[in-house]
From Swiss-Prot:
Keywords on record: Cytoplasm
Compartment annotation: Cytoplasm
Function per UniProt: May be involved in growth and survival of prostate cancer cells through the TAF-Ibeta pathway.
Annotated signal peptide: none
Protein name per UniProt: Prostate collagen triple helix protein
Major localization class: cytoplasm
UniProt biased composition (Low complexity): 81-100
GO cellular component: cytoplasm
Underlying gene: PCOTH
Tissue specificity remark: Expressed in prostate and testis. Weakly or not expressed in other tissues. Overexpressed in prostate cancers.
Region of interest (Disordered), ranges: 47-107
Length: 107
């Protein structure tokens, strides 16, 4: 019986509903202007800053990856790792080739 009463929440739910009713009514009543005010500034303001990921992510996303994103990803680690790897061994491996032109070029 007590569980049913608790589940039904006659006294607790009644109180909660009573408190929620006026709160919801007050929120709903003021919601007409309150939600419009906070929504207007929050929609354009918050979406511009926190939700701006949509706008900046779109243009900035492709711009970043296209410029620094793409080159840094494939070019940065790809080019330096690829050419630097074989270049380093090529330099010391073939010191006669680069040494000859480097020596006369330096002096």
């Amino acid at each position: 019986m007590w569980i049913l009463s608790n589940l039904m929440g006659t006294s607790e739910e009644g109180n909660l509903l009573s408190t929620v009713s006026p709160t919801v009514k007050a929120l709903f009543g003021k919601t007409r202007v309150s939600p419009i005010f906070p929504f207007s500034p929050r929609s354009p303001f918050q979406p511009l800053i926190p939700r701006t990921p949509g706008s900046p992510w779109g243009p900035v996303g492709p711009a970043s990856p296209l410029g620094p994103g793409f080159p840094i990803g494939p070019m940065g680690p790809g080019k330096p790792v690829g050419p630097k790897g074989p270049m380093l061994p090529l330099g010391p491996s073939g010191p006669v080739g680069p040494t000859s032109p480097l020596f006369p070029f330096c002096p």
